[in-house]
């Protein structure tokens, strides 16, 4: 795969796990949700990868702004979309999916929001397979699972009747 389209800008970190320093090289288009909804976060990414600012935007920050025509014109080989997205096209956008597929664009759905403990490793493994980055995906998933087990192990050692701590994660 030489040409990638992200159906949500906020999927950029997942792509970066696999692409690393080569992040913008294959990315031909993405939604503009990342920079509009998290300008400081996007600014950090664009400082590290200035080429991101040159990547075509195929919409703003909601699925209704996604332009099928712009996306198809970029000639991506694969469109990576978020399951139940909200910021980009999702599995419920049948017409958009049909147009992308009719143009010969493979469509892949990943999920880091609806069931992250179950779907994060699955999504990274799928991306690794699709993008030819299996080794990078396996390395991440191995580390991710080990860190998750470390947290779960500590929670199992809490004395009976002790409430588990509440945790909020933000990237």
Regions found by a protein language model. Name each.
Residues 1-171:
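N-terminal ligand-binding lobe of clamshell/alpha-beta domains
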